[in-house]
């Protein structure tokens, strides 16, 4: 069975098993158990590489302080034999739902202090949700047993297995997103959009030996991971990439951490925060003393797909360094607030790619002022109009905006990619050839490609009152 077949089998079974539980909720349970299996298998693999045999594994207990300390220092956590995923499977009909509760409580207690930020509370959503898997203890036990048996064959114990595990994780998230309605946008950027953004960012960073990348609305973490994987192809050493992620919703924040760890990214290269990106500016400060430890971090690339046109609180932010040079986004539409946060956190030679509703190109008022300032500061590098219905849960027309700080030219490349797609159920989907055409146009920056791309001068933009719906390029706006 190949990875596609295994992923499809797991999805079909999981979709039947979830019964009346919302797809958006059920994903947290199955993905949480996948992560626990990953950590459990990883610990067993490390033990066997250090002379532990199956015969001695039952001796793996909390009471053995020396072993506990050694495992925690090397793996980042400790799981006793009785709490291993493989032990749950071997129990057969003796397995009980309470075994999971006990195991998750023990895991939280036995995290290595140095890895607290990566693992602390990572199973909180799973722990609180166990009760929803059945009205009685027996019903919960059956539901959990079915779940762990469903995922027991996913290979997770070797470098080559990260690809299979990652594929299945992404496949499940994508399918849950397709079934989650409007809530899908909270945690998932379609893989093809991630790939497009990744190719643009990786091309910009291709000559760097070490990079830092940041997603301030990280969702499941898939966008950040795709950027890292694409950049690593140029760099050769993926361990020289540091990942920063911030996410407001706790359950989604936990998905970010799980996804990063399961892709084989070193815990020391993962820095995450559960918080509101538009309130306290992060990165970077220590949670116990935000004011005195505030030291803004500037990274090589910021990538984001923030919630579209959501309300925010601009009060008392006029002098905030993220916004002071450009202006404050209106209270009812935070799109430009997210964009300015992203732009602030790149180095002078960095790059931003952000997904936005196309209204940011022409709306007036405070947004018009910010757009004028971005153009006058020469920050807008490119605008890519995407096909309609490309995101789960919304038909809002969207763009990718590419921004930089130290551009050599003052033109803006506008690409109308709204016509290049294939139908995929209710949604539209970018094909590999569509992604290649867009990326090639971005790299080559042609003066004009008929009905697809044009380099627009700053003079023309100013003549157009700083609106970026430039006819006849912007077919995706329904103009011209």
What function would you assign to each model-found segment?
Residues 1-201, 268-277, 385-388, 410-418, ...:
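Non-catalytic, mostly N-terminal accessory regions of nucleic-acid modification and defense proteins
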Residues 6, 13, 25-26, 143, ...:
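Helical mechanochemical/support elements of P-loop NTPase systems and associated helical scaffolds
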Residues 16, 150, 154, 171, ...:
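Conserved, well-folded catalytic cores of nucleic-acid-processing
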Residues 30, 165, 210, 240, ...:
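A structure-centric signal for secondary-structure junctions around beta-strands
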Residues 184-304, 309-311, 320-324, 337, ...:
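Conserved S-adenosyl-L-methionine
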Residues 279-280, 284-289, 293-480:
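A conserved structural/catalytic subdomain of Rossmann-like adenosyl-cofactor enzymes
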């Amino acid at each position: 069975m190949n990875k596609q077949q295994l992923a499809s089998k797991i999805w079909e079974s999981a979709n039947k098993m979830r019964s009346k539980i919302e797809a958006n909720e059920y994903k947290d349970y199955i993905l949480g158990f996948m992560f626990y299996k990953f950590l459990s298998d990883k610990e067993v693999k490390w033990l066997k590489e250090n002379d532990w045999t199956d015969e001695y594994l039952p001796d793996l207990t909390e009471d053995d302080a020396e072993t506990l300390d050694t495992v925690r220092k090397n793996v980042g956590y400790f799981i006793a034999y009785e709490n291993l995923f493989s032990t749950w499977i071997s129990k057969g009909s003796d397995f009980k739902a309470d075994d999971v509760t006990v195991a998750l409580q023990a895991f939280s207690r036995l995290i290595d202090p140095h890895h607290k930020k990566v693992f602390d509370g990572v199973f909180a959503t799973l722990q609180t949700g166990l009760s929803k898997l059945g009205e009685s203890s027996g019903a919960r036990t059956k539901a959990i047993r079915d779940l762990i048996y469903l995922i027991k064959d996913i290979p997770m114990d070797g470098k080559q297995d990260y690809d299979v595990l990652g594929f299945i994780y992404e496949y499940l998230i994508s399918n849950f997103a397709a079934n989650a309605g409007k809530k899908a946008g909270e945690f998932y950027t379609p893989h093809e959009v991630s790939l497009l953004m990744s190719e643009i960012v990786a091309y910009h960073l291709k000559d760097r030996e070490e990079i830092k990348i940041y997603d301030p609305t990280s969702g499941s973490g898939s966008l950040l991971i795709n950027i890292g994987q694409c950049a690593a192809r140029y760099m050769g050493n993926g361990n020289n990439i540091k990942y920063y992620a911030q996410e407001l919703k706790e359950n989604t924040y936990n998905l970010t951490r799980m996804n990063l760890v399961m892709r084989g990214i070193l815990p020391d290269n993962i820095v995450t925060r559960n918080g509101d990106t538009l309130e306290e500016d992060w990165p970077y400060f220590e949670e116990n003393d935000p004011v005195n430890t505030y030291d803004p971090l500037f990274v090589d690339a910021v990538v984001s797909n923030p919630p579209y046109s959501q309300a925010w609180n601009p009060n008392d932010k006029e002098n905030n360094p993220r916004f002071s040079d450009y202006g404050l986004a209106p209270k009812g539409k935070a799109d430009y607030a997210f964009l300015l946060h992203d732009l602030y956190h790149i180095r002078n030679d960095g790059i931003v790619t952000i997904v936005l509703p196309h209204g940011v190109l022409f709306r007036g008022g405070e947004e018009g002022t910010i757009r004028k300032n971005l153009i006058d500061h020469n920050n807008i590098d490119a605008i890519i109009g995407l096909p309609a219905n490309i995101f789960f849960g919304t038909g809002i027309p969207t763009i990718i905006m590419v921004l930089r700080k130290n551009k050599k030219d003052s033109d803006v490349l506008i690409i109308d990619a709204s016509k290049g797609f294939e139908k995929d159920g209710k949604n539209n989907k970018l094909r590999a050839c569509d992604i290649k055409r867009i990326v090639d146009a971005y790299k080559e920056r042609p003066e004009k490609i008929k009905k697809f791309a044009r380099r627009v001068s700053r003079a023309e933009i100013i003549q157009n009152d700083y609106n970026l719906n430039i006819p006849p390029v912007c077919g995706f706006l329904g103009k011209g």
